[in-house]
Design a protein with these regions (language model features):
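N-terminal secretory signal peptides that target proteins for export/translocation
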Residues: 1-6
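Bacterial N-terminal signal peptides
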Residues: 9-22
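Short S/T/G/P-rich N-terminal loop/turn motif that feeds into the first structured element of a domain
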Residues: 24-261
């Protein structure tokens, strides 16, 4: 019940900002705010020592099976600095009922066997080349929004959070406020994903960039423009953003990474 009420509160909080955020995003060319209503399975994987390339090759071999089953390929990228995992995979599910429907399970099994790498064999190989895995099921933007964000990008930044008790709703609002600031200062809109079940994280944001320079620099704007953007987002000043966010969280991790070719 706690998980359900938390998710419901966060999603309801979205509507209090949705109109304003959609307008701000459309004015600056970013995507409109999207209700977190599409289910994804997020997997973080750490390779066994010396097995990173084997791990990547194994997942690449699995992609054809995902296509054949009708599930669609997971969106994934490789860590370069930050947390302890090596790969992040974002698997589209839509909903539990859709993903675990009997016909979908049967198609998934048939596609795996036809590929020459059964589900059981894939699991054995995955265990052999990974040190640990962590799964979290999250509600996020529509699949087409996420796919579009990944198009033409090669550098990624995830911020992942455990909120302080009772601060989940306020943290979600703060993330959306930062999105207004980002769009106003010429940066990409960070997609927000809210925990449904699984690992301890309450939510994460994912930003997609052309390259590391795009992430590090953004558009050149004046100090006055940054101040105006912060006020529009609901902050008193740009200097307030980080300290305010830290009043809401128990734990926060940043990880950067690159596209997998």
């Amino acid at each position: 019940m706690r998980n359900l009420s938390r998710k419901t509160a966060i999603i309801l909080a979205f509507f209090s900002l949705a109109s304003f955020l959609s307008l701000a995003a459309s004015e600056e060319g970013g995507p409109p705010a999207a209700k977190p209503a599409y289910l994804y399975k997020t997997t973080f994987v750490r390779a066994a020592p010396g097995k990173l390339l084997d791990l990547i090759a194994l997942y690449k071999d699995r992609m054809a099976s995902a296509d054949e089953s009708g599930d669609g390929r997971p969106l994934w990228w490789r860590h370069t600095q930050g947390d302890q995992w090596d790969l992040m995979l974002l698997t589209p599910m839509e909903s539990y009922a859709e993903y675990y429907a009997k016909n979908k399970i049967a198609r998934r099994k048939k596609a795996a066997e036809a590929s020459g790498l059964s589900q059981e064999e894939f699991a054995r190989k995955l265990e052999a080349c990974s040190s640990w895995r962590e799964d979290i099921f999250v509600m996020g933007p529509p699949l087409e929004t996420v796919k579009k964000a990944f198009e033409g990008t090669a550098y990624y930044h995830i911020e992942i959070f455990v909120s302080l008790p009772g601060k989940q709703e306020e943290l979600f609002k703060e993330r959306e406020m930062e999105n207004v600031y980002a769009v106003e200062t010429g940066r990409p809109y960070n997609m927000i994903f809210v925990r449904d079940q699984g690992a301890v994280w309450d939510l994460f944001t994912l930003g997609c960039y052309r390259d590391i320079k795009h992430w590090a620099v953004g558009d050149e704007i004046t100090k006055e423009q940054r101040a105006a953007a912060a006020r529009k987002a609901g902050f008193n000043s740009p200097d307030e953003i980080g300290p305010y966010m830290r009043t809401l969280i128990d734990m926060h991790r940043d990880t950067m990474g690159v596209a997998i070719k």
